[in-house]
Amino acid sequence: MQGILSIQSHVSFGHAGNSSAVFPMQRMGFEVWPIHTVQFSNHTQYQEGWTGRAFAAEDISELVRGLGNIGALEKCQAVLTGYQGSAEQCLAVEDTVAKVKQANPNALYVCDPVMGAPDKGCIVAPGIAENLLTRLMPMADVIVPNQFELSQFAEMEIHSLDDAITACQRALAKGPKVVLVKHLYCLENGSFNMLLATQEGIYLAKRPQFEFAKQPVGVGDLISAIFTSGLLKGWSPKQAFQHCHDACYGVLSATYHAGEWELQTIAAQQEFVEPSKHFPIEEVELEMA
């Protein structure tokens, strides 16, 4: 039985981390083997707080050893990683990816390098950003950063589309084959913008921006999950990007019109299979030097 190993946070209530990623991948036809880096009652934006704890790096390694014992690693189609709770967890992930690639050289590694955002800066514990930037992102086949995380990896500021393209090209030169920028803030103009960069081309996607009273959490996790599933279906990066963009819009639309804060992942599940709305993807023409 083939599957996707998803190593990220988990909440009991709502949809963030694995709670946002696992079901969409299952709905798109994939077995998913979740390993949680933290387990909380709810996401951390609730003013009432949250309960739960982070797991030790050894907890991750122990579960991966167990999967190896039953021969599951050679059947692993992809490793998807998101929020990591410690620098040591990043090292456990690095070791896990190496083990999976050794067991199945065709397995993908998709890294969602959760670090922060332009308005918040770096929000992760000491050592995590460094390990993401120097260890996990360079070894990934696909990275799914936001604009802030891309700027950190490319070691440059991003203020325009041209800047973002240059940053993506720098990122591709460091190892990844695909860069999906899950939110390009510098183009804010009433639309939500995403950018895809591969060696074959660069593509821009725009969709209407919903004016939520409180921004839903877990959207980036959802984007990474749908995109990973699309690639594993054998779609080209552009096709997976198109599907991911349209499906995410459908979930956000359902969430907005329901007046909810938590993503309406279950109610909008048909979007993962057949998005209800289609937005054209624009290929960005690169200026020749």
From Swiss-Prot:
UniProt pathway annotation: Cofactor metabolism; pyridoxal 5'-phosphate salvage; pyridoxal 5'-phosphate from pyridoxal: step 1/1
Molecular function, one GO term: ATP binding
Class in the EC hierarchy, top level: transferase
Reactions catalysed according to its record: pyridoxal + ATP = pyridoxal 5'-phosphate + ADP + H(+)
Keyword annotations of the record: ATP-binding, Kinase, Magnesium, Nucleotide-binding, Transferase
Cofactor needs: Mg(2+)
Protein residues bound to ATP: D112, V144, E149, K182
Family annotation (Gene3D superfamilies): 3.40.1190.20
EC number(s) stated in the UniProt entry for this protein: 2.7.1.35
GO annotation (BP), single: pyridoxal 5'-phosphate salvage
Residues noted as binding substrate in the record, renumbered to the chain: S9, T44, Q45, D221
Any one of the GO CC terms: cytosol
Xref: HAMAP family: PdxY
Function: Pyridoxal kinase involved in the salvage pathway of pyridoxal 5'-phosphate (PLP). Catalyzes the phosphorylation of pyridoxal to PLP.
Quaternary structure, from the entry: Homodimer.
Annotated family: Belongs to the pyridoxine kinase family. PdxY subfamily.
Protein name: Pyridoxal kinase PdxY
Organism: Vibrio parahaemolyticus serotype O3:K6 (strain RIMD 2210633)
Lineage: Bacteria, Pseudomonadati, Pseudomonadota, Gammaproteobacteria, Vibrionales
Gene: pdxY
